[in-house]
């Protein structure tokens, strides 16, 4: 069985983010019939009910550690998670989740991400340093790819994909 953890802005009743999560889950289930999916979410009950997956609360640090430790991969997926316009705190939260997976020697994949804007100098350095260590970067548009290029992200190769909801 393949254990996948998905991190994103889920469990807040945002229609776009929930549609993104449904698309990611559907794609994973099509590709990996025996996949077990756990979502890091703001509302475990809602995520379980709406998506029929396992869930761990986004502020349950020990639960997140345990979940990632027993997984095969972390997918940071969908939406514009890596930006500091709405909140620098959220940027550092998502970077922390990815860093945690890397500390636990788990591959990290960015899936259909919209990147930026990331305005702070320290924030740009933090994004660059972390993303240079992930296994795969998939962005949803050319502007996101350019933002990563402008930040100095040189590896892994950045792939422009369709927004998961549209694919």
Regions found by a protein language model. Name each.
Residues 1-167:
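Active-site anion-handling motifs in enzyme catalytic cores
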């Amino acid at each position: 069985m393949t254990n996948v953890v998905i991190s994103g802005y889920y469990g807040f009743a945002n229609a776009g983010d929930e549609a993104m999560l449904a698309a990611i889950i559907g794609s994973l289930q099509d590709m990996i019939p025996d996949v077990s999916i756990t979502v890091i979410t703001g509302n475990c009950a809602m995520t379980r009910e709406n998506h029929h997956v396992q869930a761990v609360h986004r502020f349950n640090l020990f639960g997140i550690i345990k979940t990632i430790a027993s997984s095969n991969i972390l997918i940071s997926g969908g939406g514009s998670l890596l930006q500091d316009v709405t909140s620098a705190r959220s940027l550092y939260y998502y970077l922390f989740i990815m860093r945690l997976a890397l500390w636990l020697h788990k591959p990290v994949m960015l899936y259909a991400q919209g990147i930026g804007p990331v305005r702070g100098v320290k924030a740009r350095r933090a994004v660059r340093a972390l993303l240079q260590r992930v296994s795969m970067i998939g962005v949803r548009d050319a502007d996101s790819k350019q933002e990563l290029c402008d930040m100095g992200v040189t590896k892994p190769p950045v792939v422009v994909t369709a927004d998961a909801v549209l694919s």
